[in-house]
C-alpha cells in the first residue's frame, strides 16, 4: 500500500510539475523543426490542501527552470533559458485515484524567458499507468506571448518529497524533472 501511495503521490506531483514544465515531450512527425527545444526542465511542486485517501479538490503550484534551450534558426529568441510556473486544479484528487493512473488533468503555465519575454500555456496532462504512473505526458497550446498559437509537448517524471502516507500525513510536495525535451512546435 505504501508503494501505491508513493506512486500516486509521485504521479500527482508529476502532473503538477508537468503543468509547470509546460511541455516536455517528443516532437511530432509534422513538426520537423521545432521553434524551441529545452533539454532540461526541473523544479518543485506544492499541493494544497494536500493529497490523502479522501477525495478532495487540490491546487498544485509548480515552479522550475528550463535550461539548455535552443531555437529554430531565424525564429523567435528566448535567451536560452526560462523560469516557469504552473497552476493545476485537481478536482476530487486522492492518493487512490492517482495511484491508479490514467488521469487527465488540466492547468495553465507561464514561462518568463531569459530575455524577459513570456509564453503562457493551456495544458492537458495525462498520467501513465503501472511503472509509468509517476510520468505525465503534456500537450497544449501557447495562448499568449512569444510563440502564441503554437502547440507544446513534453513529459515529466515526479518524485514525492518527504514521507507522506496519505492517511495521517498528506502529500504536500514533490520534485519533477523532464524525461523528454520541452518542445514548442
Protein language model features and the residues they cover:
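Glycine-centered structural positions embedded in regular secondary structure
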Residues: 41-43, 107, 154
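N-terminal segment immediately downstream of the Sec signal-peptide cleavage site
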Residues: 30-92, 163-185
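A charged, solvent-exposed segment within the mature domains of Sec-exported extracytoplasmic proteins
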Residues: 128-185
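Secretory targeting and sorting signals
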Residues: 1-31
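Solvent-exposed, flexible loop/coil residues
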Residues: 5, 51, 55, 151
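Predominantly extracellular/secreted and cell-surface proteins with exposed
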Residues: 53-143
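Small disulfide-bonded, cysteine-rich extracellular recognition modules and tandem repeats
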Residues: 4, 20-21, 41, 72, ...
Amino acid at each position: 500500500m505504501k508503494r501505491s501511495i508513493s506512486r500516486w503521490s509521485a504521479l500527482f506531483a508529476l502532473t503538477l510539475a508537468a503543468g509547470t514544465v509546460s511541455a516536455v515531450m517528443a516532437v511530432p512527425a509534422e513538426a520537423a523543426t521545432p521553434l524551441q527545444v529545452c533539454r532540461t526542465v526541473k523544479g518543485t511542486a506544492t499541493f494544497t490542501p494536500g493529497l490523502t485517501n479522501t477525495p478532495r479538490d487540490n491546487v498544485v503550484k509548480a515552479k522550475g527552470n528550463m535550461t539548455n534551450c535552443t531555437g529554430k534558426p531565424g525564429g523567435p529568441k528566448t535567451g536560452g533559458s526560462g523560469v516557469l510556473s504552473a497552476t493545476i486544479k485537481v478536482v476530487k484528487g486522492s492518493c487512490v485515484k492517482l495511484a491508479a493512473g490514467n488521469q487527465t488533468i488540466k492547468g495553465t503555465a507561464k514561462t518568463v524567458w531569459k530575455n524577459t519575454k513570456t509564453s503562457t500555456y493551456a495544458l492537458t496532462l495525462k498520467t501513465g499507468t503501472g511503472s509509468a504512473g509517476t510520468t505525465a505526458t503534456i500537450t497544449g497550446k501557447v495562448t499568449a506571448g512569444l510563440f502564441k498559437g503554437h502547440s507544446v509537448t513534453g513529459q515529466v517524471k515526479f518524485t514525492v518529497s518527504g514521507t507522506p502516507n496519505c492517511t495521517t500525513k498528506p502529500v504536500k510536495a514533490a520534485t519533477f524533472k523532464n524525461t523528454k525535451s520541452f518542445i514548442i512546435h
